[in-house]
Amino acid sequence: MTQPLPWEKNTAAPVPPAPEPVPLDAYTAPAAPEPELVPLDIYDAPVPAPKPAKPLVDIDSLNPAQREAVLTTEGPLLVLAGAGSGKTRVLTFRIAHMLGDLGVKPWQVLAITFTNKAAAEMRERLAALIPNGTRGMWVCTFHAMCVRMLREDADLLGYTGQFTIYDDDDSKRMVRDIMQALGIEQKQFPINMIRSKISSAKNAMIGPEDMLKSADSPNDKKAAQVYMELERRLRAANAMDFDDLLVRTLELLRTRPEVLDKYQERFRYISVDEYQDTNHVQ
């Protein structure tokens, strides 16, 4: 037998021995423990109520009577108290509570004051209580409210939206001119008396014709005559005096149901400061 040459020898690596067989259960993970059984009745236990959110308005800073007024937000509410007792503070806290804690929208609130200064102070107080939360809310005087309404719908009463507002001096000047044109002597019929009677009639919703019919004194008759001419001239000039702003707005709301519905739908909460000073038309 021929011997293989040296370079023909098998130089392959030796074959390693076969691994020992491993039991099958060595690869099986240990079984997880059985879960504990939970009694069924724990799912029926009452869920604790969430803690109420802290009010945005510091109600605790109010006395019991003030707190009751602030928290009474539905239905009519009349606050009777002496001067300096905090009525305006209650009013502003009540509005802030509605906006900040109850989710009332700013445009649903109308707050009325008697002076521009009081309106500005109320806006400042509300801004301090709820910063950036009063946009769209009306905080104004009766006359300013009426101007806003009339600017939008005065055409329904025969005016244009750009009507002129006569201040006290303008009105007095026009009454003086009318008295001169009618030959009414100011010495016998003082202009302030004439204007006062006309203003009272307007705020009682009495027109010049009705005033003349019911006049039972020379003063009332002269005032009614001036009143009639004053109305004619104001209409011709597309103008209103301060009394007209109130009277025409009331006329608008009484004679135009669609306008009344619009504002009733918008203003869900109306607050009036110094309500005891309001007159009939207000």
PLM feature spans:
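A basic/glycine-biased coupling hinge at the interface between accessory DNA-binding modules
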Residues: T2-A12, P16, P21-P30, E34-V57, ...
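N-terminal pre-P-loop "Q-motif" helix
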Residues: I59-E74
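Short alpha-helical elements of helix-turn-helix
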Residues: P64-R67, F93, H280-V281
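Walker A/P-loop
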Residues: E74-R94
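Charged catalytic and DNA/RNA-contacting regions of genome-maintenance
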Residues: D273
